[in-house]
């Protein structure tokens, strides 16, 4: 069985039917200055039931490519955003 990557982030945009854009933040150590800096990346995730809203905190799991840019599907909703 293969290991599937999991990402945790915040929904920043509803990108069409059954798709949401999730912003993932990670901390890395700067190679020269040895200070922790934040790095950001957006992923498109598949939301089969259209249950996500902007501001929700979610966990997504890697899956087979569903489109040109979408390779993650929704696993759980950790917290709901502001209504």
Swiss-Prot record:
Stated name of the protein: Small ribosomal subunit protein uS17
Signal peptide residues on this chain, from the entry's feature table: none
This protein's record includes keyword Magnesium: no
A biological process from GO: translation
Top-rank lineage group of the source organism: Bacteria
Quaternary assembly: Part of the 30S ribosomal subunit.
Organism: Aliarcobacter butzleri (strain RM4018)
Cellular component GO terms held in the UniProt record: cytosolic small ribosomal subunit
Keyword annotations: Ribonucleoprotein, Ribosomal protein, RNA-binding, rRNA-binding
Family statement: Belongs to the universal ribosomal protein uS17 family.
The UniProt record lists the keyword Zinc: no
PANTHER family, per database record: 40S RIBOSOMAL PROTEIN S11 FAMILY MEMBER, SMALL RIBOSOMAL SUBUNIT PROTEIN US17M
CDD domains documented for this protein: Ribosomal_uS17
Function noted in UniProt: One of the primary rRNA binding proteins, it binds specifically to the 5'-end of 16S ribosomal RNA.
GO molecular function term, any single one: structural constituent of ribosome
